[in-house]
Amino acid sequence: MADQKKVSEAAKEREIKISSSDNEIFLVPRNVIRLSNTINTLLMDLGLDDEEGTNAEPIPVQNVTASILKKVISWCNHHHSDPISTEDSDNREKRTDDIGSWDVEFLKVDQGTLFELILAANYLDIKGLLDVTCKTVANMIKGKSPEEIRRTFNIKNDFTPEEEEQIRKENAWCED
């Protein structure tokens, strides 16, 4: 029993080397990076999950730059002790008003950074970060007209007035 406790404490203290797409290396505590299902699966597949110490070769994260990976690690560090959700996300009502105050402050970034965080959370399979970033974008859209959404996200309207009218007629039932 005491040996198991030592192993779990060692695993908690273990650091994982991760390399960003621009070759910056980060040392991340194992209990922090556990939020990434992608990294967890890789460590298990390579048989590195139970070893003590630090992996010799960094795990490459080719789709994430150092600046974004730093933010992802910061988010994981803040949330590493949160309980892992066991709810089936398909069976519960989607809400966008349940973003914690720390996350609201953390996500006060420019749109480009927000979208890069979404891509990184998706690539690294960090469900909590993906949920909170997508909710932030949903809140940016909520209650806005199509024109306001275009302005918010700098989207060019490529519909002709006739095409727009046709779409309005086909979707009139949505606005009742």
Curated annotation (Swiss-Prot):
InterPro entries: SKP1, SKP1-like, SKP1-like_dim_sf, SKP1/BTB/POZ_sf, Skp1_comp_dimer, Skp1_comp_POZ. SUPFAM superfamilies: POZ domain, Skp1 dimerisation domain-like. Keywords: Developmental protein, Neurogenesis, Ubl conjugation pathway. GO terms for cellular component: cytoplasm; nucleus; SCF ubiquitin ligase complex. GO terms for molecular function: cullin family protein binding. One of its GO terms (biological process) is negative regulation of gene expression. Probable essential component of SCF (SKP1-CUL1-F-box protein) E3 ubiquitin-protein ligase complexes, which mediate the ubiquitination and subsequent proteasomal degradation of target proteins. Regulates cell proliferation during embryonic and larval development. Involved in synapse elimination in early synapse development. May negatively regulate the apoptotic activity of cep-1 in response to genotoxic stress. Plays a role in sex determination. Probable component of the SCF(sel-10) E3 ubiquitin-protein ligase complex containing F-box domain-containing protein sel-10 as the substrate recognition component. Interacts with cul-1. May interact with the F-box protein mec-15. Interacts with dre-1. Interacts with syg-1. Interacts with sel-10. This is Skp1-related protein. The gene is skr-1.
